[in-house]
Amino acid sequence: MSMTVWEWFEQRSYHHRDFEGLGRSSGNGAERPSTTLIFPARNVAGTIGTILSVVQDLRARTGLPDQVIVVDADSPDGTADVARAHGAEVYSENELMRAYGPAQGKGDAMWRALSVARGDIVMFADADTADFEQHFVYGTLGPLLADPQLQFVKAAFRRPFKQGEDKILDGGGRVTELMAKPLVNLFYPELAGFVQPLAGEFAARREMLSRVPFFTGYGVEIGMLIDVFDQVGLAAMAQVDLGTRQNRHQSLANLSRMSSVVLRTVAAREGLGQRLDGGLGSGALDNGVPGLWEQPDTYLHAVATEEGLRIDEHLNELIERPPLASLTDDTALSSIV
């Protein structure tokens, strides 16, 4: 089924209120697909307990979700202990898929967590959300539970920005607005209807997720959006309005690094390095400068400080994990836990 972005926006945009019945029901869920909720977590002891309490209250009333996983980055702040105390299955990201070495960021943690997910439908959510509510869960899962033709649902929301006592209702999501959306409009205009293309909250059918690769770091969300689109097409994708979502804000320097990874991820999917290299095949421009996709994994960030000018070098590796369904090597499969 082919759809224009306008048709898709009208027909595949939902509101969490459309699925309030899921939040109020008390059935045992035997006839519906099973569900797994995964939280990639790093130093979120201050929020993960409250979030899991909300999830457990929903689970006690409705049976949603069937499985709750926290995959922790060996956080020194006690994130894992808090999560266990609130009833979650807790895994160290470095203990899953050990054949691939230490985990290399959020996307890698998500990929590894998928290996222990049992649900027919898998939902991911950020663990640093300050205003997590039950409708985040049933709203995101709802379209997939209601429509067997859908394969992927992305959360949409308003992103407030709070600085001191000042609050700008739509001031958050700076990487989304300044980098991701312009790139999507330029290279993937069919996906321009997604309000939050970088949202960490999304749900998908596990069988489909097992067929897509995962970028290991900040590129995981935009890379997955593109790869799911290539796998199932726009008509099998949807978004749901969750209202307002507030999470911790990053410094501009960190946002700059994130933006560079989003840019390189789209460049990788577009083969942009090959396009920039003038067809030389060596990955270099006529002047010897590497094409965009062949650029080194370091990101140079020049800043002016009170002490003077400084240039910082950051490692921004763009690593891609293979689809789980493609893994047939006994060593890789036996190292799941």
Positions of PLM-derived features:
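Terminal low-complexity segments of carbohydrate-biosynthetic enzymes
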Residues: 1-11, 250-337
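Short, acidic, metal-binding catalytic loop of nucleotide-sugar glycosyltransferases
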Residues: 53-65
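A conserved acidic beta->alpha catalytic loop
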Residues: 72-80
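Acceptor/aglycone-binding surface of glycosyltransferases and processive sugar-polymer synthases
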Residues: 98-106, 110, 132-206
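Conserved catalytic loops of nucleotide-sugar-dependent glycosyltransferases that act on lipid-linked
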Residues: 170-265
